Amino acid sequence: AAALTACQGKAAEPDASAAVSEKTGTGASETKEKKQGEKESSGVFESFTAQDLDGNQVDETIFEDAELTMINVWGTFCTPCLEEMPDLAELNREYQEKGVQIIGICSDTINADKELDEAQLEKARELAEQTGADYPHIAMSGTLVDTLLPQVMAVPMTIFVDSEGTQVGTAYMGARDKEGWAGILDEVLASVQ
């Protein structure tokens, strides 16, 4: 499995102590206060290739039908990741009518040679099923190994992208409950509408 071993629990209450530049859905740059648990990330999803947990090819077209996609990077070893997955599944169903989809990316599906690990893929499939996380899940594979994985310092990490795969706002580190994510989803969705 991949060398990523850090796991973050529930995020603390937001702390608006530092300002960062934020990329919006229109590509404009504006200043927004950075909250605790947020991190900037580059636009690795505008052009990528990978496989889902069942071996099907996936690329940036996965974002086309949603106004906003919440990408949750998780690990099979990460208890906080697994604990928030049922809430994410509920949010995926509740926000579909608003043009939002949730996609998971399992961070530990490759071996030291950057090849897919079948045992880890099976474990990821089982955990997604056990947690009721019935939204799409992508394996850390293809171009994501070199573009996304180096940016993942801990899991869960959540990134929002628009229909073209352009990142919206900052990346969020750590798990949250359903209400916490709903508030963030509402705020980010408003910024792309």
Each predicted region: which residue ranges?
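Short, internal strand/loop/helix patches
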Residues: 120-161
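A short beta-strand-turn-helix
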Residues: 47-69, 93-94
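C-terminal motif of bacterial Sec signal peptides marking the signal peptidase cleavage site
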Residues: 3-6
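Thiol-based oxidoreductase modules, predominantly thioredoxin-like and allied folds used
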Residues: 99-121, 133-142
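Conserved redox-active cysteine motifs that mediate thiol-disulfide chemistry
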Residues: 73-90
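Thiol-/selenol-based redox modules, centered on thioredoxin-like
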Residues: 160-193
